[in-house]
C-alpha cells in the first residue's frame, strides 16, 4: 500500500500548508474552491512542493465553461480565475487541464474531467 507515502488532510488547507514543515511531490487541492481561497492556497502549495513537484487542481474549468453537455450550472469559477489572476500578478505557475480521461468520469459516457496539473517554472 501507499499508507506511508500518502497523507490526506481534512481541514483548513491554507493553515495546514503554512504550518507544515514537510515537503511534498504532489499536492491535491480539492476543498473550498472560492476565488479568495485559491488565491491563498496555490502560493502556499507551491511553498511546500519538492523541486519538480506538482499541484493537482480539482474543479478547474478553462475559460469558466462547462465541460459536460447539459451541465451549464456545473461550473466552479474560483480555481480558473484565481490561477489566471496569480499568473497575471507574476506567479510562475503553468497549468494544464487534464481534458479527457480513458475512463468515464462524472457523467455516463463522458470522459472529460475538471482536473488540472500545475507546476512551477523559472
Model-derived features: positions:
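S-adenosylmethionine/decaboxylated-SAM
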Residues: 1-122
